[in-house]
């Protein structure tokens, strides 16, 4: 193996590199520092991918459902000012999540585009190499119960769920509203906000009903780091949506 400390390898790199390319290092010390930095970046990327895959394996599906994998801001249809505002808020949320942490809740009737914009946020983050899970509360509870059946405590699943970069909890308020479900939601929001990881919520409930369901403490935590509540106050748009290959 060539000894880079002799300087021969560095000189060879300089000769072989295109004239318009500047090497990120000029000395042996800089080369070693560059290698360490690149190695750390790669390790972080692998760890993120592993976290995503572990949660997906437990849920037995990918982070974003096939129906929403092509959702983006550009193909979100705007027909009124409310939708225009929701789109603007979703874009702003995505911008903040690219470099930091924020929370959000989308509230409205079924079919009003909550999942589309949440998936658009998630898809943008996935392209940036971040980890994203959009999951219903019912699926969270099913995965927990399955872990109990396997003789596990469910702690491993909760820990993995709380380590992805963005977790979006869907269909809050549709569940049976048992004490166990409330405790699980509290644990998830508590852990994620305490570790500065973002939480999204999708619900048919209004703000007061959500506060009654989850409690004032959790709703207050959702306002951390500029958290937003966005209302989707219009009728379902699903009758106007046609999936490729499906006749309307």
Swiss-Prot record:
UniProt-recorded Gene Ontology molecular function terms: ATP binding
Origin superkingdom: Bacteria
Coiled-coil intervals, chain numbering: 33-57
Statement: the UniProt record of this protein carries the keyword Secreted: no
Matching Pfam families: IstB_IS21
GO biological process terms, semicolon-separated: DNA replication
ATP-binding as UniProt keyword: no
Keywords tagged on the record: Coiled coil
CDD domains noted in UniProt: AAA
Protein name (Swiss-Prot/TrEMBL): Uncharacterized protein YdaV
Species this protein is from: Escherichia coli (strain K12)
Phylogenetic placement of the source organism: Bacteria, Pseudomonadati, Pseudomonadota, Gammaproteobacteria, Enterobacterales
Gene designation: ydaV
